[in-house]
């Protein structure tokens, strides 16, 4: 068990002994430098994985990226597209005795999948709904100031709630 106040060293690295200089081996060996003892241990799969940035912050990455993309586009253009390519047969071979040649192209048959049939007769008519006529109160409230709007709303609710004579409200479900 390590003494209190000391950092635990990772496996493969030893804590400095009494004969050591008092500094840890980590402080002496930075990323990319070899340990003091001279043995060529590499802790990791590659020395590049030490977390050091390979690109300088001078805009060179963008240039490299653009060059790489241009090269890929050139390669795509040079390569033929994947898929079966059939050479067009000569017209005389296509019009042989077993193959009558079509003159009209794809033909008059069209797919009706997903299409409306029947033209405009079956389509719903939209935008023809008659507008609701405004009542006199609504016309007054639209023109008037805030107080007139408030009073019109109060009148509307009083008409629905109760009469002044019997002070009863109609049943509400």
From Swiss-Prot:
Residues 80-90 have a biased composition (Pro residues). One of its GO terms (molecular function) is RNA binding. Residues 1-119 are annotated as: Disordered. It is an enzyme of class 3 (hydrolase). The keyword Transmembrane helix does not apply. Keywords: Acetylation, Exonuclease, Hydrolase, Nuclease, RNA-binding. It comes from the Eukaryota. The modification N6-acetyllysine is found at residue 143. Residues 14-23, 43-52 have a biased composition (Low complexity). InterPro entries: TRIR. Residues 1-12, 64-79 have a biased composition (Basic and acidic residues). GO terms for biological process: rRNA catabolic process. Its EC number is 3.1.13.-. The C-terminus contains a key domain which is responsible for the RNA digestion activity. Part of the telomerase RNA 3' end complex which contains about 488 proteins. Exoribonuclease that is part of the telomerase RNA 3' end processing complex and which has the ability to cleave all four unpaired RNA nucleotides from the 5' end or 3' end with higher efficiency for purine bases. This is Telomerase RNA component interacting RNase. The gene is Trir.
């Amino acid at each position: 068990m390590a003494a209190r106040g000391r950092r635990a060293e990772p496996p493969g690295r030893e804590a400095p002994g009494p004969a050591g200089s008092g500094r840890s081996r980590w402080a002496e060996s930075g990323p990319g430098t070899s340990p003091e003892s001279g043995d060529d241990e590499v802790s990791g799969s590659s020395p590049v994985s030490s977390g050091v940035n390979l690109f300088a912050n001078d805009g060179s990455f963008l240039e490299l990226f653009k060059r790489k993309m241009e090269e890929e586009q050139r390669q795509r253009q040079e390569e033929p597209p994947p898929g079966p390519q059939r050479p067009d047969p000569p017209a005389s071979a296509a019009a042989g005795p077993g193959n009558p040649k079509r003159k009209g192209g794809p033909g008059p048959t069209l797919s009706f999948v997903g299409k409306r049939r029947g033209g405009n007769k079956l389509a719903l008519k939209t935008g023809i709904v008659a507008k609701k006529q405004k009542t006199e109160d609504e016309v007054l409230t639209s023109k008037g100031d805030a107080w007139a709007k408030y009073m019109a709303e109060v009148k509307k609710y009083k008409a629905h709630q109760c009469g002044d004579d019997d002070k009863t409200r109609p049943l509400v479900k």
